Amino acid sequence: MFKIFSTKWFRSAPVVATIWIVITAGILVEWNRFVPDLLFHPGL
């Protein structure tokens, strides 16, 4: 594929952790945009 994906710095822990957090945050933001009622439970 791309040469950048095989470099050593791309596979380092801070880069992988940053990408993982960004992807997780994006999924949560989009999920809460379409289904916002699951964030708050007024009956509890």
From Swiss-Prot:
TM segment ranges: 9-29
GO cellular component: photosystem I; plasma membrane-derived thylakoid membrane
Membrane topology: Single-pass membrane protein
Alphabetic keyword roster: Membrane, Photosynthesis, Photosystem I, Thylakoid, Transmembrane, Transmembrane helix
Pfam families in the record: PSI_PsaJ
One Gene Ontology term from the biological process aspect of the record: photosynthesis
Keyword Thylakoid listed: yes
Gene3D superfamilies: Single helix bin
Subcellular location: Cellular thylakoid membrane
Keyword set includes Coiled coil: no
Family label: Belongs to the PsaJ family.
Function noted in UniProt: May help in the organization of the PsaE and PsaF subunits.
NCBIfam families registered for this protein in UniProt: PRK02733.1 (NF002743)
Protein name: Photosystem I reaction center subunit IX
Record organism: Prochlorococcus marinus (strain SARG / CCMP1375 / SS120)
Gene behind the chain: psaJ
